[in-house]
Amino acid sequence: MEQHFEHLSCIPYLENTEASRYQTLDIWIPTRHQHGDSTHGYWIIFIHGGAWRDPDINATNFAEKAVLDLITSGVSQIIEGIASINYRLSPRTPSQPVPSGGHVGGEQQAMHPDHLNDVISGIEYLQRKFRFGNRYILTGHSCGATLAYQTLIRQTMDKTETHAAPHAIIGVAGLYDLPLLRDMDPMPPMCHQFLLAAFGSDETLWRDVSPATYGDFERLWPTGKLAVLVYCEDDEYVSPAQLNTMYHALEIWGEKEGRLVKTLKLPGGHDEVWRTGSGLASCVEKSINYLQDLSVSEA
């Protein structure tokens, strides 16, 4: 039976403060729980890409087509809610086209860790409102996949509030090794420009915040169950080397019983996966099925 969802858009996730229009999220909530025990369902949380700087990609247009597919899919009964998080963006560069909405002025001034702080603030807001604990799947595309894995290292940094890590992370066309991204840039000097804008000129920082360089996923993600690495068959921007280096980084973590590291291939180019929605939705659906299989094997 199809699950019916209500869409709430542009919700500020920073309380008692004046939020930027980028510090908002969208939520899709079932109008009623049709599957009984809600403690066995999952929240799906999307993080859009756009090289930390593209105002034409936002929480709504990134997720809305995938959501339409998910609410009519075979796993809709397992979904407790869906969210998509906006975050502040880095400065534009001269080579970047003017966004369709016009000039954004001085509003794009974010630099690491601003993007990450915003994503975590969005997750913490959702946790306070819905209390789903670890029962969520963090799904990021391109730099959104970077941010998804960076939420794990944020736990070890100076933060007054912490959040429960997800049971699963889906990285779609993810950027996992930032120096490697710069070195294999198919459109020089595009990657170098947006990495400078997002992280500054210290390339030691680029390496330190690259998920593929994290040394101990067992310590960073002890409650994790599933890592899904997705690549696009005709990706114009991201080399398969990004997936390969991340798979290698997760190998030891994934050897523990009750965990999986999976790779998926999608047809099409870098942005086609979310623009059509079906690719993004299929990754989530397969991941929910993987998690259910893990639960059965643990029972």
Swiss-Prot record:
SUPFAM superfamilies hit by this protein: alpha/beta-Hydrolases
A single MF term (Gene Ontology): hydrolase activity
Top-level class of the enzyme under EC nomenclature: hydrolase
Its EC number(s): 3.5.1.-
Pathway field: Secondary metabolite biosynthesis
Region Disordered: start-end pairs: 90-110
Keywords linked to the UniProt accession: Hydrolase
Keyword Chaperone included in the entry's annotation: no
Superkingdom of this protein's organism: Eukaryota
Gene3D superfamilies the record matches: alpha/beta hydrolase (3.40.50.1820)
Chain span(s) of sequence motif HGGXW: 48-52
Active site annotation, chain numbering: 142
Protein family per UniProt: Belongs to the kynurenine formamidase family.
Domain notes from UniProt: The main chain amide nitrogen atoms of the second glycine and its adjacent residue in the HGGXW motif define the oxyanion hole, and stabilize the oxyanion that forms during the nucleophilic attack by the catalytic serine during substrate cleavage.
Role of this protein: Kynurenine formamidase-like hydrolase; part of the fragmented gene cluster that mediates the biosynthesis of fusarochromene, a tryptophan-derived metabolite closely related to a group of mycotoxins including fusarochromanone. Within the pathway, fscH converts the product of fscD into 4-hydroxykyrunenine. The first step of the pathway is the epimerization of L-tryptophan to D-tryptophan in the presence of the NRPS-like tryptophan epimerase fscC. D-tryptophan is subsequently hydroxylated by the tryptophan 6-hydroxylase fscE to yield 6-hydroxytryptophan.
Protein name: Kynurenine formamidase-like hydrolase fscH
Organism: Fusarium equiseti
Taxonomic lineage of the native organism: Eukaryota, Fungi, Dikarya, Ascomycota, Pezizomycotina
